């Protein structure tokens, strides 16, 4: 890692120039001069003889100096590099939804709901469970990845309110993940919507899971769900579903919604988008602008 030199006044500018002009190749990045440099001593070169000695940025303003100093620094890799994410930003949105898919991957229901939310002014990051959970994960590992995604996209898209949405496999995992988020990240989450919630969660996609065969690694959802604030939760299920936890949750003060159809809710995407938007609005802080 080679340093960047800054000449802050006439004398500093002359010294920075001299250092670059006499530097060994690739030992400094260059010099930025925040004003005219003083004259060099007799016999001293002020210009580098080779590009490998570095560059000299003349008469640089404060921002140009700052940019020149930062440019050569190694950029940190996002903590979630390589995760199977789908970005759907909504221009000007202050709201961010993280949508964790079912174990079939990023399919028509996930795509449709996410696109509908973006049309309503909510930025969405989709999370492909099939690709992510094809290797065995732990709740702690997945929660750490989720925290990194939330923190990065809040910063990148200037979002201050977060909604967590899970469908099927993703819904089963979501209570485990929320409970393991760092407190500061958890505080940014306004609502959690669980679509097609089951009784047990798995942290690895398997063929047996597609066939409905339980795994010895499955963990019960109810103990984790009991730790969540009930007011922020929405549980949606299809009237034809036979094995869903949602109906039993209404007695706990959790909002429960029944739709037509089975586990895919008759593919009524507009109705699902409206339910999710309404849950977000109910849990938004007082005075927050509504999504369009």
Give the location of each predicted region.
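Second-shell loop/turn segments in exported
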Residues: 102-104, 131-140, 152, 163, ...
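Residue in the alpha/beta-hydrolase core beta-strand immediately N-terminal to the catalytic nucleophile
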Residues: 161-163, 167, 190-193
